[in-house]
Design a protein with these regions (language model features):
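N-terminal small-domain helix-loop-helix segment of the aminotransferase-like
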Residues: 1-50, 57, 234-236, 346-350
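Conserved PLP-anchoring active-site segment centered on the Schiff-base-forming lysine
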Residues: 61-83
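Active-site phosphate-binding strand-loop segment of PLP-dependent enzymes
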Residues: 96-164
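PLP-dependent enzyme catalytic core of the Aspartate aminotransferase-like
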Residues: 110, 291-305, 311-350
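Active-site PLP attachment segment
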Residues: 167, 173-211, 224
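Structural signature of PLP-dependent enzymes
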Residues: 210-216, 234-256
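Conserved glycine-rich beta-strand-loop-beta hairpin in the small C-terminal domain of fold type I
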Residues: 231, 246-256, 267-280
């Protein structure tokens, strides 16, 4: 990324095309064809300022006031804001920590459906749950979408982060979804380049893409240099993803083994992303966190995590749960999880 940016030697740093730099668009298309045998054309893609802008544009294009958005709970909390800005509302599909947060059954999907449902959002693999959908579950969702003439927003920013023999798969691999599918992606997680703020939206629905391009034109363009750098990232070989997965799998296993030392804890080993949800034997995870930050030290060290209640739209849900992001080296992850364990003992004894 940085080598490509440093190699830029034009005299003038010009505006890029609103849809995106053509070389970058072509590199994205080549990546999908090489890694997933998916045929995208540059006209099927619009480059955005991170996946967040891709989602904002998508909701602006397809959501009308009063529309309902189905999404499995817990979910990435910014979706609540994206929906509210357009006058839509989140309708959570309930899940359970004991069931590993799985939601893709016909009964569960149909129970959440109403005459106001416009779209279902699938974050796959999931944030904050780390849930990786099986191929069968993806097909169930696809059939549900087509039968009810819904939009499917597939947030696939963590797509390559899958473990235990799971093969990375995109909803774009399901041909019958062609006109119903909107894929959201970014360089942030896949290439550890969050600060580049490069994302994109991809769809074969021409009417939808026309609306997205109009929105892209209204904000001129995405940073030229970041697109130049990102072009090279999408040329990385498959071995890059294999090495990345091997390392994150080790980190996940380290976190899981340490967390499972806690008596009465509920934790399912996640199949993807780099997040792990933990249901602790306490009433209030946020209160526990404040204890760790303000009162607890072990060798002058403590730990911080994300209380999971913020990932729920249903008031009162997730109060005993936390989200761990296993993005540090394994030795740090091991120590952090040990601090949760020992801190929990001190918290319950106070």
């Amino acid at each position: 990324f940085m080598d490509a940016v440093r190699a830029f030697d034009e005299d003038v740093l010009m505006y890029e095309q609103s849809q995106g730099d053509i070389k970058f668009l072509e590199s994205i298309c080549d990546y999908y064809k090489r890694e997933y045998s998916i045929e995208y054309k540059p006209t099927d893609i619009v480059v955005t300022m991170g996946a967040s802008e891709a989602l904002t544009m998508t909701f602006t294009t397809i959501i009308d006031p009063g529309d309902e958005i189905l999404i499995a709970e817990p979910f990435y909390s910014n979706y609540q804001t994206f929906a509210l800005v357009r006058g839509g509302s989140i309708c959570p599909i309930p899940t359970s920590s004991k069931e590993g947060y799985r939601y893709a059954s016909r009964d569960r999907l149909e129970a959440a459906l109403t005459d106001k449902t416009k779209v279902i959002v699938c974050i796959n693999p999931g944030n904050p749950t780390g849930l990786a959908l099986t191929a069968e579950e993806m097909d169930i969702i696809a059939d549900f979408v087509i039968e009810n003439d819904l939009w499917l927003i597939a947030d696939e920013a963590y797509r390559e982060y899958v473990y235990d023999g799971i093969k990375p798969r995109s909803f774009a691999n399901i041909d019958k979804l062609k006109k119903n599918l909107i894929v959201i992606d970014s360089v942030s997680k896949r290439f550890s380049a969050c600060g580049a703020r490069i994302g994109f939206v991809a769809s074969k629905n021409e009417e939808f893409m026309t609306g997205i391009i109009k929105l892209a034109q209204s904000r001129l363009c995405v940073s030229t240099l970041e697109q130049i750098g990102s072009t090279e990232l999408f040329k990385l070989p498959s071995s890059y993803y294999e090495e990345m997965n091997e390392e994150y799998c080790k980190r996940r296993d380290t976190a899981y083994e340490e967390i499972m030392q806690i008596p009465d804890v509920i934790c399912h080993k996640p199949g993807g992303a780099f997040y792990m949800m933990v249901d602790l034997p306490i009433d209030d995870a946020e209160d526990f966190l404040m204890f760790l930050l303000t009162e607890y030290r072990d060798n002058n060290e403590t730990v911080m995590f994300a209380p999971a209640a913020g990932f729920y739209s249903t008031l009162g849900n997730g109060k005993s749960e936390i989200r761990i992001a296993y993005v540090l080296e394994s030795s740090y992850i091991k120590r952090a999880c040990q601090l949760i364990c020992t801190g929990l003992e001190a918290y319950k004894a106070k």
